[in-house]
Structure formats: C-alpha cells, structure tokens
C-alpha cells in the first residue's frame, strides 16, 4: 500500500512562529511513518516557503532550550540568521506538483490559524487538518467568538471591545470608557493573538495605559474582560460530524495568569488531568465544549478553554483554539492521552478526519 504524503506546515508570519516549530517537531516525531510520508514545509517570518532540506533540519533543532535561555526576539533573530545561512531557494507552492495528499497545519496565530491558509488550501484542492475557513476565521477573533457562544447559551465574561485606532486617537477617553464598563481587576487581550501573547492583567488605571498600548500595538482590535475568579479548565475536542470531548484538564498558574512562559517553557504552572472538580461539573464543562464547538462550526479539532467561577460554579467560556499547541507539554495532546488516544494515534486520527469525504 502506498503511503500518504503529508505536508507539515510550520513557522509562519505570526508572533507564535517559534512555538509552531516546537509543535511541528513533536508532530513529526509521532507521525506513523508506515502510513505517511513527511514533507516538512517551513514558512519563514517573511512568508517564504522552504521545503524539505532546511525544514527537515529545523525539525531536529532544540528550539525549546533556546527559548528558555533567551527572549522570543533573540530566538527569532537567530532563526532568521539560520535561514540566511542555509541559502536555500524558496520551494514551489504548487502542492500537487510536490505530490502532497494532505496538509497538517501546525501554524499558530495569524496567517495560519485564522482562515487564510485554510482558504489557500481549499483553492488548491488539498485537504487539511483542523477547522475549515469560516470556523478558523471566527474563532481567531475573541470578540466574535464570545458573541457566537453566548447566542448558544454559554456564559462569557463581562467586557468590551476597543479598536486600536480609536485608542491611539484618544487614549484618555477610551480608558475612561473601559473603567465605566469593566471593573478591576481586568484582562486586556489582543483580539486575534494566541499563546497569551500581549495579554495583561490590570489592577488600576496606572496599569491600564501600558496594557492597552501593548495590546493595540499587536492587533487592530482589543478585548477587555472582567476577571473570573476560579479554576481554569480546558477540554480537547476531536471530530467532524460527531465530535468527542476529552477528560477535563486544569491549569493552576504559577503567576496571576497562564502566560507564554508557563504554556511553553513549563516554568511554574501546575497541570492537573483530570481536573480537580466534581464529575458532574466535568460533564457540564464537556457538554459546553461540544456546544461551543458545534456553534462555531468547528471540525477536526479545537481546545476549548473555560473558567469555573469559584463562588457560583458557573462555567464561563474563555477562548477556543483551533490549532492548539502540540508541544510535549501542551494540554491538547495530554488530555487526549488521558482519554485513551495516544499522541501517535491522535496525529493519525486528525489526518483521517481531514481526508473524510464530507470535509472535502
């Protein structure tokens, strides 16, 4: 039986470039090579595609240790120097000519998780893992995600949305408007970034100004939300027409919230699988995850994140990630492992879901 050629896309033009590489390294290491042939395609910071040679080398680079010892900016600069040193010509973007049967997307954030890459692959006639164009674009926007899931009956945190252009034009007025609508402590989030990049927890006006400045520099729209005091619970969802929800996972941040360092460097957060909540509450969270998944039109996979309010036990949606982290310490593969699906089988199942006739 001939093997299926899988184009593994990673890197990309988002702020999550380096994490995408680490996710791709784990995916490549767990790919069933008896069924699949790997064609790694690395997308540089500037958007060039580098196939096979340098891309394959990059999959064996110990990037996680580099991130631990330096800033993201320093790591990005080092990667760009590696690309220049490789002096490899960009590859052909005709995926059919490259013999690609299916694409595995390990591209986090903008230009990979937001529907643009999905749309490109649709026009090429190449099936791909994860959600389709609409769900990818919709869930990338935290503000629109909240509107959709609230309409489906799922609770969301109180908040407001800010256009960066409005803030830059009149910061004092926008800050006053925020304070009139949302109580401290609050969170300031770029609407369309993941991995906690650009997120700040704010306790007063003095902290609000730099938080909004930082978020507005990263995105054209910013979400401001009230803090939900309670447990952070996550669920991995897998499937197309008949999705399944994993056991719940729980995050106990080592800091005020689960930031970039804790997500990918494993510094201080504690992870609990299953979550330390009653089984009845776990069932409610899983049902809510499936409701959100369907309401948003998701397919393939998504990680659905919630808060459980400590005073009321109400389940409040935090966000939905359609290409969740796939590093060795990422919650999605760990929750699936705890639900009886090994990392290797998870990769295979995602490729099978991508190739289902209804997805094509």
From Swiss-Prot:
Residues 146-352 form the ATP-grasp domain. Mg(2+) 2 binds at residues 319, 321. Pathway: Cell wall biogenesis; peptidoglycan biosynthesis. Its cofactor is Mg(2+); Mn(2+). This is D-alanine--D-alanine ligase. Cell wall formation. Binds 2 magnesium or manganese ions per subunit. The keyword Thylakoid does not apply. One of its GO terms (molecular function) is ATP binding.
């Amino acid at each position: 039986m001939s093997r299926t050629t899988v184009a593994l896309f990673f890197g990309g033009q988002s702020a999550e470039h380096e994490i995408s590489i680490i996710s791709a390294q784990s995916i490549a290491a767990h790919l069933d090579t008896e069924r699949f042939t790997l064609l790694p395609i690395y997308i540089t910071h500037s958007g060039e595609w580098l196939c096979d040679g340098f891309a394959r080398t990059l999959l064996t680079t110990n990037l996680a240790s580099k991130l631990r010892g330096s800033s993201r900016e320093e790591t990005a600069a080092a990667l760009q120097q590696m690309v220049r040193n490789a002096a490899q010509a960009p590859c052909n973007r005709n995926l059919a000519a490259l013999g690609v049967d299916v694409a595995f997307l390990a591209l986090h954030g903008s230009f990979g998780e937001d529907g643009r890459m999905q749309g490109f692959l649709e026009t090429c006639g190449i099936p791909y893992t994860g959600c389709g164009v609409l769900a990818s674009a919709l869930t990338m926007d935290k503000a629109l995600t909240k509107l959709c899931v609230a309409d489906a009956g799922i609770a969301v945190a109180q908040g407001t949305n800010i256009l960066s252009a409005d803030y830059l034009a009149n910061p004092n007025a926008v800050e006053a408007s925020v304070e009139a609508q949302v109580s401290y402590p609050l969170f300031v989030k770029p609407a369309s970034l993941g991995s906690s990049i650009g997120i700040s927890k704010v306790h007063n006006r003095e902290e609000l100004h730099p938080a909004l400045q930082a978020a507005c520099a990263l995105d054209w729209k910013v979400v401001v939300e009230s803090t939900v005091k309670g447990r952070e619970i996550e669920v991995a969802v897998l499937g197309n027409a008949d999705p399944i929800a994993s056991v719940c996972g729980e995050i106990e941040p080592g800091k005020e919230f689960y930031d970039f360092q804790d997500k990918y460097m494993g510094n201080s957060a504690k992870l609990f699988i299953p979550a330390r909540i009653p089984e009845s509450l776990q069932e409610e969270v899983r049902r809510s995850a499936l409701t959100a998944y369907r309401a948003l039109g998701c397919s393939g996979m998504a990680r659905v994140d919630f808060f459980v309010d400590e005073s009321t036990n109400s389940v409040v949606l935090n966000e939905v990630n359609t290409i969740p982290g796939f590093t060795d310490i990422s919650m999605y593969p760990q929750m699936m492992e705890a639900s009886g699906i090994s990392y290797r089988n998870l990769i295979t199942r995602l490729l099978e879901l991508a190739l289902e006739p209804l997805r094509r």
